[in-house]
């Protein structure tokens, strides 16, 4: 039995990379999923809640390249950049769409602005599936 995260799926003992579709926009989150050979916790590591946190983004990207299923137990979800909207627009810490700081709007609102919806999506579709968040 594998692990499903939105439109992405990974089998036990496998690694997959792709783009997680967001239901409220055409933006997609770059994600790497690794399902270890043994059962264990589900861990989320992300970069780019603030889109100019380049060290975190690079760290997640490097980790995603290096880690393999035999290196972990459980499931590792790596979101390389969460605030892709702000990253693409080169804003420092806010979404270009609405000027909001993603880190300040959790748990979000499914009927709110772009950033509110992104926070809501993270809460409902991702945070709800993890045991630990780094």
Question: Where are the model-predicted features located?
Answer:
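Structured catalytic-domain cores with a bias toward divalent-metal coordination
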Residues: 1-134
């Amino acid at each position: 039995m594998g692990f499903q995260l939105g439109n992405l799926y990974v089998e036990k003992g496998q690694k997959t990379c792709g783009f997680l579709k967001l239901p409220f926009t055409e933006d997609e989150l770059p994600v790497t999923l690794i399902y270890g050979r043994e059962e264990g916790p589900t861990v989320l590591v992300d970069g780019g809640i603030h889109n100019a946190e380049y060290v975190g983004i690079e760290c997640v990207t490097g980790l995603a390249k290096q880690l393999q299923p035999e290196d972990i137990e459980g499931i590792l979800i790596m979101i390389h950049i969460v605030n892709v909207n702000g990253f693409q627009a080169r804003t420092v810490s806010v979404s270009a769409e609405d000027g909001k700081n993603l880190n300040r709007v959790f748990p979000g609102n499914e009927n709110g602005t772009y950033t509110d919806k992104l926070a809501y999506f993270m809460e409902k579709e991702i945070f709800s599936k993890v045991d630990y968040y780094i």
